[in-house]
Amino acid sequence: EDLAAVMNLFHQFRSQFKVQAFEMFTELALGYVLKHTDLQRPFETETPYYVLIEIENENDETLDAALGLLESGMESGAILDGTLSQTKEQSVQLWRLREDISEATSHYSPYKNDVSVRISEVPGFLTEMDQILKEDYPEFDVVWFGHIGDGNLHINILKPEGWNSDDFIEACHKVDDRLFGMIQAKGGSVSAEHGVGLVKKPYLHLTRSQTEIELMRQVR
């Protein structure tokens, strides 16, 4: 239901199971996937955040324990709803809800960033950055998703209808100033998965030492 519940669930699963994946995405992200694919909503309840969890199923006791943890979360209200894949096909359909986000948002000329923060900083970072974007750019749809297990987060800002590309990119660069400054304050990285690139190059000094930057130049 909220980021605190998401993080609590992550820590519970990580402490009890061999977690192979713990992916988070928002209702907004899911909405775009449902709009542009043939996928169906996995359950009726809408919630701000969704997680996909994959654990190593060592034996029947592992599955029973995982189900017990989910049931406990639903009883406490931390988890609003959930579903369990029973077949390979069901698993594929559930994973498409996360994996099809990039394709679904590609229709809106997204401005993309992939960043990382310490796991403990994820809730505060997302909350603060989301508030800044809502205040400064209320017309932007901002799609968040990522790998909670390693603090890697993807941010796709979708170009509003009626905006020309130059104005949109200029506005997004202003977002970068706020975003990367916050990343620096939280000891994160301005580039999690997809490399530095020309856009992020001026900000690399915020999260990398001069020695690290020189090494990156040498191995390029």
Predicted regions located by residue number:
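Noncatalytic alpha-helical scaffold of FAD-dependent oxidoreductases
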Residues: 1-220
